[in-house]
Design a protein with these regions (language model features):
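Alpha-helical transmembrane segments and their immediate juxtamembrane cytosolic regions
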Residues: 1-318
Length: 318
């Protein structure tokens, strides 16, 4: 019996990444809050994208590979189209699509291979970016590590939900997920503390957009905690969190709307306002809930899915 590919908790986590980006882009934040949040919403978005690639690639074939490549290319094109209206926002879709293409072959690998590539990407990113003193907007090597990290979190938190597993295997997976979450809590506590330490070694910086070991490990740890919590809440209170899950199912659509509305708002009304950010979040939650209930798939998601099926029909490349 096939398991459902739509996981409520994963959709909630995806919506929290979008909400986090809205807050960072639009809200008037205290310096300390900026330090805490810097880079985490976008890295969470990337890590969840890596986990989503694993869901797409469960029955991996050459068709899957071609469709992931095509998906990445389409995301890049959408990102490029948004660049002229990005305004104060550094559009994340270009790097998202590029990394998706670069790691499109990895869902076919085993967990240990992906772990090895995660370590390699993290080391390469640290070697490259540690000497740099200025923040990197979206450092490519670190983003490759984020996507692979998301694939590893799929193995820990999601695989058993999508595959028929025995009771003993489910118990093992459950224990592993709690162990990973517990370790992630410790890493997050340490990382958040040292985000405020300017004297820390360059390779160990935990601050956002540095692309080094500290930030990468912290970002994956935060994503693990968020994902585990969202899965817990989504399993037990799906009705209460429906608006967030709905937003998560159409995150591309909401992100596009966010960039477009933020460009107008910040050019013509207010550059940064916490009230405005809250208003847009509520607006997008309502819009997503209504669209999901009465229409279904988000318009951008439907457009991308239709284009992918047209470009790479089922069975192509086998």
């Amino acid at each position: 019996m096939n398991k459902p590919s739509r996981i409520v908790g994963l959709d909630i986590a995806r919506s929290l990444a979008i909400i986090g980006m809205i807050i960072v882009h639009m809200a008037s934040l205290l310096w300390s809050t900026k330090v805490v949040l810097s880079g985490l919403p976008s890295s969470l978005f990337a890590i969840i994208a890596g986990a989503t690639m694993m869901i797409i690639g469960r029955n991996y074939s050459s068709t899957t590979f071609l469709r992931l490549i095509t998906r990445g290319a389409l995301i890049i094109l959408i990102g490029l189209a948004l660049l002229p209206v990005g305004g104060e926002i550094q559009v994340v879709l270009v790097i998202m699509g590029l990394v998706m293409m670069l790691v499109s072959w990895m869902p076919a690998l085993g967990t240990w291979w992906r772990l090895g590539f995660f370590v390699a990407a993290t080391l390469a990113a640290t070697i490259k970016y540690a000497p740099m003193t200025l923040p990197q907007i979206y450092p490519l090597l670190a983003w490759i590590a984020y996507f692979i990290g998301g694939m590893l979190l799929y193995d820990v938190y999601l695989r058993s939900r999508l595959q028929g597993t025995s009771t003993s295997e489910n118990g093992t997976n459950s224990r592993l997920s709690w162990i990973v979450t517990a370790v992630s809590v410790v890493i997050t506590a340490v990382g958040m503390y040292f985000r405020f330490d300017p004297e820390i070694a360059g390779w160990l910086r935990f601050t956002g957009h540095t692309g080094v070991f500290g930030e990468i490990i912290l970002s994956v740890a935060v994503a693990a905690i968020v994902l585990h919590l969202c899965l817990f809440v989504g399993d037990r209170f799906p009705t209460a969190v429906y608006p967030f899950a709905a937003m998560g199912t159409m995150s591309l659509t909401i992100y596009i709307l966010h960039v477009l509305t933020a460009f107008y708002w910040q050019q013509n009304v207010l550059l940064h306002s916490t009230l405005s950010a809250a208003g847009f979040i509520v607006f997008f939650l309502v819009i997503a809930s209504l669209w999901k209930k009465f229409v279904g798939q988000g318009p951008a998601e439907k457009l991308v899915a239709t284009a992918i099926k047209a470009i790479v029909p089922s069975g192509k490349g086998k």
